[in-house]
């Protein structure tokens, strides 16, 4: 695939919003599964990486909103915080992928993920302290809420998202980010086979 069209990106964004509804429902049986695994984060981050910043932002805002309206999760009082947090994840991951060109896909993916995760958590934490929590939000509460309690989810996202992205690219469902690198790899593989 040479390039994703606006229609392609819109369809993928809608799919990721749907996953924001479905994935949390699958974790209902696990106590505090939503907190531990942060299931909405995965499709939003993936949407930002694949479709770009505007679509990632839309996915991050609509995901919690649609999920809350359809399933009651997140609860209505917490929904605005999640909309900001996830919107930032989608926006930042898309921006980093747009402007960072290291020459290596894995480096770009992990840089985008880490910067988006940190940026989203820091900005949302500041907003919670200044606006949503009225000055009663502490550093320890921020660290516990955004890093400690959701550590399994962070690890899963850092493992799965690059794997999914690379798999989609290799299946020709996404444009190849570095065609020259892929061509070189194919050439070396061909040479190896010819020498057998």
Annotate each predicted stretch with a short phrase.
Residues 142-156:
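Individual transmembrane alpha-helices with interfacial aromatic-anchor signatures
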Residues 1, 5, 9, 74-78, ...:
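Membrane-helix interfacial "entry" motifs
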Residues 185-192:
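Conserved small/polar residues in nucleotide/adenosyl-binding loops
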Residues 22-38, 62-96, 132-133, 141:
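Interfacial aromatic-anchored transmembrane helix boundaries in multi-pass membrane proteins
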Residues 2-50, 54-55:
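Hydrophobic transmembrane alpha-helices
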Residues 2, 11-22, 59, 81-129, ...:
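Short helix-perturbing small/polar motifs within transmembrane alpha-helices
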Residues 175-184:
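Short, highly charged, low-complexity non-transmembrane loops/tails of multi-pass membrane proteins
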Residues 41, 45, 83-90, 154, ...:
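Alpha-helical transmembrane segments of multi-pass membrane proteins
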């Amino acid at each position: 695939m040479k390039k994703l069209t606006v229609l392609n990106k819109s369809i993928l964004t809608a799919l990721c919003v749907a996953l924001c509804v479905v994935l949390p429902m699958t974790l209902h049986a696990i106590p505090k599964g939503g907190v531990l695994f942060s299931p909405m984060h995965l499709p939003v981050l993936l949407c930002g990486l694949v479709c770009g910043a505007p679509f990632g932002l839309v996915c991050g805002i609509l995901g919690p909103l649609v999920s809350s309206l359809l399933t009651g999760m997140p609860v209505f009082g917490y929904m605005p915080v999640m909309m900001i947090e996830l919107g930032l994840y989608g926006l930042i991951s898309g921006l980093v992928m747009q402007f960072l060109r290291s020459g290596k896909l894995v480096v770009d993916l992990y840089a985008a993920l880490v910067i988006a995760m940190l940026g989203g958590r820091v900005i949302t934490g500041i907003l919670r302290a200044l606006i949503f929590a009225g000055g009663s939000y502490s550093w320890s509460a921020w660290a516990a809420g955004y890093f400690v309690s959701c550590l399994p989810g962070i690890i899963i996202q850092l493992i799965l998202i690059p794997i999914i992205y690379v798999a989609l690219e290799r299946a020709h469902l996404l444009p190849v980010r570095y065609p020259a690198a892929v061509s070189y790899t194919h050439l070396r593989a061909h040479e190896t086979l010819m020498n057998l």
